[in-house]
Design a protein with these regions (language model features):
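Short, solvent-exposed amphipathic helices
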Residues: 101-117
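N-terminal helix-turn-helix DNA-binding core of bacterial DNA-binding proteins
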Residues: 19-64, 85, 90-92
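A short, conserved structural fragment
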Residues: 76-83
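N-terminal leader segment of winged-helix/HTH proteins
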Residues: 1-31
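A cross-family signal for key residues in well-ordered alpha-helices
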Residues: 29, 41, 73, 104, ...
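Basic amphipathic alpha-helical segments that dock to polyanions
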Residues: 65, 69-72
Length: 119
């Protein structure tokens, strides 16, 4: 578990100053959580149910998957809906427009990394 940064520390002050000039570090911290972008991408590729995502990533714990889905939903990157005519009622996840914008950026970053990783 990550520890909280003490308010009196120089690290805290540096992060505060950086945040005043640019929020990229905070964005990268939020989207860089383990499994988060992989889950978002899976949902965008029609792997849209909890159990199906688990099959793609069998080592991903139920607890972490539920937490990441909750975070993606709270950040309006995905939304949850019911699959009609299913008993018991089943849920599916879909990517929002905001989420699709982020996926495009992540794919561009991936292409950039592929291009420059050996240089």
């Amino acid at each position: 578990m990550a520890s909280e940064i003490k308010v009196q520390s120089s690290n805290y002050e540096n992060l505060r100053i950086l945040a005043e000039y640019c929020n990229v570090n905070e964005i990268l911290k939020r989207i860089g959580l383990r499994w988060k972008m992989q889950i978002l991408y899976c949902i965008s590729e029609d792997v849209y149910q909890f159990t199906k995502i688990k099959k793609v990533f069998p080592t991903l714990s139920d607890q972490v998957l539920a937490k990441r889905i909750s975070e993606l939903s709270e950040e309006a990157l995905i939304y949850k809906s019911e699959i009609p005519n299913t008993t018991p009622q089943q849920l599916k996840y879909s990517v929002t427009e905001k989420g699709m914008d982020l996926i495009r950026i992540i794919l561009d970053l991936n292409s950039w990394g592929d291009k420059w990783e050996n240089q």
